[in-house]
From Swiss-Prot:
Keyword tags: Acetylation, Calvin cycle, Carbon dioxide fixation, Chloroplast, Lyase, Methylation, Monooxygenase, Oxidoreductase, Photorespiration, Photosynthesis, Plastid
General remark: The basic functional RuBisCO is composed of a large chain homodimer in a 'head-to-tail' conformation. In form I RuBisCO this homodimer is arranged in a barrel-like tetramer with the small subunits forming a tetrameric 'cap' on each end of the 'barrel'.
Signal peptide region: none
Molecular function in Gene Ontology: monooxygenase activity; ribulose-bisphosphate carboxylase activity
Disulfide cysteine pairs (residue numbers): none
Gene behind the chain: rbcL
Name used for this protein in its record: Ribulose bisphosphate carboxylase large chain
Gene3D superfamilies: RuBisCO large subunit, N-terminal domain (3.30.70.150)
One term under GO cellular component: chloroplast
Function (record text): RuBisCO catalyzes two reactions: the carboxylation of D-ribulose 1,5-bisphosphate, the primary event in carbon dioxide fixation, as well as the oxidative fragmentation of the pentose substrate in the photorespiration process. Both reactions occur simultaneously and in competition at the same active site.
EC number: 4.1.1.39
Organism per entry: Weinmannia silvicola (Towai)
Length: 58
């Protein structure tokens, strides 16, 4: 029989979802000549922040 080991949930990976605006959303980003831009019209459902709805497109 193999020895038992203890696994700590806080080590390595922590499950959960972070707000998009905390990780990738950069409102003051300035475009470069090499950027490719696309436009999407997004209408968030009631209670959903606009940047979170936009993250669904990204």
């Amino acid at each position: 029989m193999s020895p038992q080991t203890e696994t700590k949930a806080s080590v390595g990976f922590k499950a959960g979802v972070k707000d998009y605006k905390l990780t990738y959303y950069t409102p003051d980003y300035e475009t470069k000549d090499t950027d490719i831009l696309a436009a999407f019209r997004v209408s968030p459902q009631p209670g959903v922040p606009p940047e979170e709805a936009g993250a669904a497109v990204a």
